[in-house]
C-alpha cells in the first residue's frame, strides 16, 4: 500500500479543495469513511493509522501508515504513547501531505480512549497548526459502560488535543446513548460517526455554500482560530413559529455538552431557508432576539443562505468557541461513583489528589446523572511482588489486554496464577525453615520453641 498522498482534488467549480478531513485511528477512520460515502462535499480525506490492515480495508483512497518502523504496521495496542511515537516518526510525511499550497483548514477527527486516535491525533494537530493551517479537532469520548480507565485515557487525550488545535469539538457518546435510548450497540457507534459527520459538514457548508449574506473561510477562521473548546449545533423548524423552533432546538441540544452558547467569546450562525416557502420579514423578530442576546461585547457573525433541499423548512447552524473551561464543569461532584480509594504504595494524600484531578477532568464532560445510571468499574492496579515478577505465565496474562478491557475470565485466570505462585512460595519458605531447624544444635532448637515464633502461613 502506498504511504503517500495523491494530489488534492478540485471542487466542481474548478477551485482547489482547501479543507481536509483527517481520520486518525479506528474511530476516526470509521467517521471519515462515513463522510466519504455521505454528504460532506468539497473536502478531501486522509486516513492515518498504525494498523496496516485497517487501512487496507478502507475505500478512502488517500492513506498513511504511521510509524511503520515503530509498530511494524500492527497497531498501537491501545497504548497512546506508542501511537504518539509512531506519529512523530512519520512527521516528515505528515508535513509533506499538508504543506501542499492548497490546504487552509484541517479537521482532525478521532475516537478518544483507544491507542492510535488518542496518541497520534494531537501530534497531527500540532503539525497542521505549525504550518499555520486552521486546525479543528472533532473527537468522541467513551460511553460510560466502557469504564473509568478508558474514560480517563480518553479525557487525557482530549486535553492533549486542546493544546494542539485551534478549536476542539467534543462529542460525548454517553449523551448520544441517552438521547437515542432504543439504539442497538452497533447503531450507537454509527450515530457517533453520523454526529462527527454533521459537525464537519456544518462547518464546511458554511464556507462552501454561497449565501445572500455570505459566510466564507475568513469568517470561520475568525470564529475558530485559537478558539479552544467549541460547539456546533443545528436546529430545524417547520410550520408556524418555525424560526423560533429552529433556534430553540439549536440552543437546547444535549450535544452542547452543557455549554451555554451565550457564554462563548465568539459566535457565528447561518440561517438556511428553502425555496418553497422563503422566510418572511415578520419571522426576523426571532433572529433579532437571538442577536440581541449574543451581541454583548462578543464577536458575532451571521449569514443567510437558500437551500432548495429544505422545502418549507428552515435551519440554523450555530458555531461558537472560546468557552471558559469553568463553564463546562458540573456544579455537582461525582464523588464515590468514580473516586474510590485504591490500596497501593502511593500515599493516601497522593491518591486523594489524583482522584480529585481525575474527577475534575471527568466532570468537564460527563454529568453526574449520566454516571449514576451505569455502574462504572474502578480499576485497581495490580501490585506484583518479587515472586510474581519472575513468573512468565502471569506476565503474559497481564499483557494480553489493558486493565479496562480485561473480562471476568481473564481476571479469574490471573487470580488463579497468583494463588499458585503464593502457595508455591509459601511451601518453599516452609521447606527452608524446616531445613534450617534440622541443622541447628539441640540447645538452639529448644530455645526456638519459645512462644515468640515467626509464621510463614
UniProtKB/Swiss-Prot annotation:
InterPro entries: Cell_div_FtsZ, Cell_div_FtsZ_CS, FtsZ/CetZ, FtsZ_C, Tub_FtsZ_C, Tubulin/FtsZ_2-layer-sand-dom, Tubulin/FtsZ_GTPase_sf, Tubulin_FtsZ_GTPase. Keywords: Cell cycle, Cell division, Cytoplasm, GTP-binding, Nucleotide-binding, Septation. CDD domains: FtsZ_type1. Residues 429-447 have a biased composition (Basic and acidic residues). Residues 429-457 are annotated as: Disordered. One of its GO terms (biological process) is FtsZ-dependent cytokinesis. GO terms for molecular function: GTP binding; GTPase activity. It comes from the Bacteria. GTP binds at residues 26-30, 115-117, 146, 150, 193. Residues 448-457 have a biased composition (Polar residues). Essential cell division protein that forms a contractile ring structure (Z ring) at the future cell division site. The regulation of the ring assembly controls the timing and the location of cell division. One of the functions of the FtsZ ring is to recruit other cell division proteins to the septum to produce a new cell wall between the dividing cells. Binds GTP and shows GTPase activity. Belongs to the FtsZ family. This is Cell division protein FtsZ. It comes from Porphyromonas gingivalis (strain ATCC BAA-308 / W83). The lineage of its organism: Bacteria, Pseudomonadati, Bacteroidota, Bacteroidia, Bacteroidales. The gene is ftsZ.
Amino acid at each position: 500500500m502506498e504511504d503517500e498522498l495523491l494530489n488534492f482534488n478540485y471542487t466542481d467549480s474548478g477551485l482547489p479543495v482547501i479543507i481536509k478531513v483527517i481520520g486518525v485511528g479506528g474511530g476516526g477512520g470509521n467517521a471519515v469513511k462515513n463522510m466519504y460515502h455521505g454528504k460532506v462535499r468539497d473536502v478531501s480525506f486522509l486516513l492515518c493509522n498504525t494498523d496496516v490492515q485497517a487501512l487496507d480495508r478502507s475505500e478512502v483512497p488517500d492513506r498513511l501508515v504511521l510509524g511503520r518502523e515503530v509498530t511494524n504496521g500492527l497497531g498501537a495496542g491501545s497504548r497512546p504513547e506508542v501511537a504518539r511515537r509512531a506519529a512523530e516518526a512519520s512527521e516528515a510525511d505528515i508535513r509533506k501531505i499538508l504543506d501542499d499550497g492548497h490546504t487552509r483548514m484541517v479537521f482532525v477527527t478521532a475516537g478518544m480512549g483507544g491507542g492510535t486516535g488518542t496518541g497520534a491525533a494531537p501530534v497531527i494537530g500540532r503539525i497542521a497548526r505549525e504550518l499555520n493551517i486552521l486546525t479543528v479537532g472533532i473527537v468522541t469520548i467513551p460511553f460510560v459502560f466502557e469504564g473509568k480507565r478508558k474514560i480517563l485515557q480518553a479525557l487525557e487525550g482530549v486535553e492533549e488535543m486542546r493544546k494542539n488545535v485551534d478549536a476542539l469539538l467534543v462529542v460525548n457518546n454517553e449523551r448520544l446513548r441517552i438521547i437515542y435510548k432504543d439504539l442497538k450497540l452497533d447503531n450507537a457507534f454509527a450515530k457517533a460517526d453520523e454526529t462527527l459527520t454533521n459537525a464537519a459538514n456544518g462547518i464546511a457548508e458554511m464556507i462552501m455554500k454561497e449565501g445572500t449574506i455570505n459566510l466564507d473561510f475568513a469568517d470561520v477562521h475568525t470564529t475558530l482560530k485559537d478558539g479552544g473548546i467549541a460547539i456546533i449545533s443545528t436546529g430545524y423548524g417547520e410550520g408556524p413559529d418555525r424560526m423560533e423552533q429552529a433556534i430553540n432546538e439549536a440552543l437546547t441540544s444535549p450535544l452542547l455538552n452543557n455549554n451555554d452558547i451565550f457564554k462563548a467569546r465568539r459566535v457565528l450562525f447561518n440561517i438556511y431557508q428553502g425555496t418553497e416557502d422563503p422566510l418572511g420579514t415578520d419571522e426576523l423578530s426571532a433572529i433579532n432576539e437571538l442577536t440581541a442576546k449574543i451581541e454583548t461585547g462578543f464577536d458575532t457573525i451571521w449569514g443567510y443562505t437558500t437551500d432548495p433541499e429544505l422545502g418549507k423548512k428552515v435551519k440554523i447552524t450555530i458555531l461558537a468557541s472560546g468557552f471558559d473551561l469553568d463553564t463546562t464543569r458540573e456544579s455537582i461532584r461525582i464523588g464515590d461513583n468514580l473516586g474510590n480509594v485504591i490500596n497501593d504504595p502511593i500515599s493516601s494524600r497522593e491518591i486523594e489528589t489524583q482522584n480529585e484531578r481525575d474527577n475534575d477532568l471527568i466532570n468537564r464532560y460527563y454529568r453526574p446523572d449520566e454516571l449514576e445510571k451505569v455502574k462504572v468499574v474502578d480499576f485497581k492496579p495490580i501490585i506484583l511482588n518479587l515472586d510474581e515478577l519472575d513468573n512468565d505465565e502471569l506476565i503474559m496474562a497481564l499483557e494480553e489486554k489493558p486493565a479496562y478491557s480485561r473480562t471476568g475470565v481473564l481476571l479469574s485466570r490471573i487470580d488463579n496464577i497468583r494463588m499458585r505462585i503464593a502457595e508455591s512460595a509459601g511451601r518453599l519458605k516452609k521447606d527452608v525453615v524446616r531445613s534450617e531447624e534440622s541443622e541447628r544444635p539441640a540447645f538452639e532448637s529448644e530455645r526456638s520453641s519459645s512462644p515468640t515464633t515467626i509464621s510463614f502461613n
